[in-house]
Amino acid sequence: MKYDAVIFDLDGTLTDTLEDLKNSVNYALSQFGFPERNTEEIRSFVGNGVKRLIYLSVPENTPDEISESCLSVFREHYNNHSCEKTKPYDGIADLLKLLKDNGIKTAVVTNKMHSAAEDIVKYFFDGLIDVTVGQIDGVAQKPQPDGVYRVLDLLGVSREKAVYVGDSEVDCITAKNAGIPCIGVMWGFRDRDVLIKNGADYIVDRPLDIFDYI
């Protein structure tokens, strides 16, 4: 095998989380009398953490203190509703089982709240993901490479033996900043041009295609 570890993004890569994210965003917005956002708007807002998601979702020129209150409502609601509509993409479970059977270590590095990320990974992929790192105090979020370095240290794997898999420009830049290759996936929240423009080393159309590069 070329690599000893595969590090995955979560939203748009392993799981389709848009509906649960949209529902929690709209619940939070409704508590402040703000208009709802549609699925495509949420799709374009995700990738840079929940604070950025909420700040883009509230109306323009919303005072920061109101945005922060809306964020708190979102966090509480999403922590309790993160697995209602969310589901793994077809073929992901088969890929993770194949990696495990071949002794490849796996991890998730995501800008999602750490508690929600752990809940989703445990609910859908219990025993198939070795390490999960979401938003944690003291660990800079993507595209900074801190989360990648953290999981490599926990897994005991060097950068030369790891690859990152994601669906967005944030993932491509994260991999580049960490000094590891990036496999871009076509079933997520961004299109092929975004992945190419941001330097994905490989682009795949199906989850099992990832194994060909491992």
Model-derived segments and spans:
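Substrate-recognition/cap helix-loop segment adjacent to the acidic, metal-dependent catalytic center
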Residues: 30-32, 36, 53-62, 85, ...
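Acidic, Mg2+-coordinating phosphoryl-transfer loop and its flanking beta/alpha structural elements
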Residues: 163-204
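Structural recognition of alpha->loop->beta junctions
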Residues: 125-132, 194-211
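Structural signature of beta-strand start/N-cap positions in the alpha/beta core
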Residues: 4, 102-105, 161, 181, ...
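Active-site neighborhood of HAD-like aspartate-dependent phosphohydrolases
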Residues: 1-44, 55
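A metal-dependent, Asp-based hydrolase signature
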Residues: 48-80, 90, 97-98
